[in-house]
Amino acid sequence: MEEFYNTKVKEIMIPQRDIPFMEENAGWVEFLDRLSVRAHAWVVNNKEEMKVVGIVTEHDILRNIIPPTHRKIRMFGIHRVDMLHKETVVQDIMTHNPVICSPEETVTDVLKKFSTFNIRRLAVVDEKKRLLGEITIQLLVKDLRYRFRNTE
């Protein structure tokens, strides 16, 4: 198990080319298209720089489609107004400043973040916060399963 805990993120992560992402100014329709296939998408400032600025998930959809009369969430002391309209962009509904990790961090570091922040995935970024990939609990489980099956 020690070898597993010391494994670097870069050895397990899914590379950026294989993960869902969109620009922060993407429209509501693009967001819904992406989320109808995947449970999340990383949000980057633009496709040239690829700096991670947020994440959109199924929970973000839920937060924004619940009728105002059923919402428990309050912002600035008042109930939020519906944000679903054609002009809505991903930046309006995403979770800002997601928890991130570097490719040099270890599985132990990632597990601590998953536990501390009660999350299931992390964006893997370089020192300039550019998206390199992602690591998920599911990936760690698959890696651990592989190790158990292939060691005697």
Language-model regions: role of each:
Residues 1-152:
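Tandem CBS (Cystathionine beta-synthase) repeat/Bateman regulatory domains
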